[in-house]
Amino acid sequence: MEISMKIILLGAPGAGKGTQAQFIMNKFGIPQISTGDMFRAAIKAGTELGKQAKALMDEGKLVPDELTVALVKDRIAQPDCANGFLLDGFPRTIPQADALKDSGVNIDYVLEFDVPDEVIVERMSGRRVHQASGRSYHIVYNPPKVEGKDDVTGEDLIIRADDKPETVLDRLAVYHKQTQPLVDYYQAEANAGNTKYFRLDGTKKVEEVSAELNSILG
């Protein structure tokens, strides 16, 4: 029996989606598709869609949904997506979700990683980075041997602007505004029998969340 693993991941920045996406990819051998990577690849390859996207991006304009969906369809028609794929960061809006559905892409699972805002702020504002190497630490979960210093070089660690609490809160506000309608949309789709919707507690240990995913996806 052919398994189908067409999955959408929902979750705020810092909710642990990336870690679990890696787990799903390794376990089921399906690729993760991020629209950012797709645009970069299409632009690099000089495809027709890539050229259109580049022209818009160069003018600082947003790429319209039709173009993004066309790019997604193009990407998921590749052989490595035969058994499924993980969509991360798309769809972001109801029109994108509708366009995806209208283009005949049936989603098997929607997985939402739920983490309270205050936990995300703690996770992200505790990050420290060694700029030259990209090595990252966390003051609570993965502290450096010497406070504020890189383990290898002993150089100073920095807080990325993106990880400052006020920036994180701004990003979370945008995320909730954009994503709550999608949560409602896919829960309604699940109620109609068109997909399966699961909300996972992202505050649990990584291994626990992975085990839960394993039993959901089988």
Swiss-Prot record:
Pathway: Purine metabolism; AMP biosynthesis via salvage pathway; AMP from ADP: step 1/1. It is found in: Cytoplasm. Belongs to the adenylate kinase family. Its main location: cytoplasm. Consists of three domains, a large central CORE domain and two small peripheral domains, NMPbind and LID, which undergo movements during catalysis. The LID domain closes over the site of phosphoryl transfer upon ATP binding. Assembling and dissambling the active center during each catalytic cycle provides an effective means to prevent ATP hydrolysis. GO terms for molecular function: adenylate kinase activity; ATP binding. Its EC number is 2.7.4.3. Residues 126-163 are annotated as: LID. Catalyzes the reversible transfer of the terminal phosphate group between ATP and AMP. Plays an important role in cellular energy homeostasis and in adenine nucleotide metabolism. CDD domains: ADK. It comes from the Bacteria. This is Adenylate kinase.
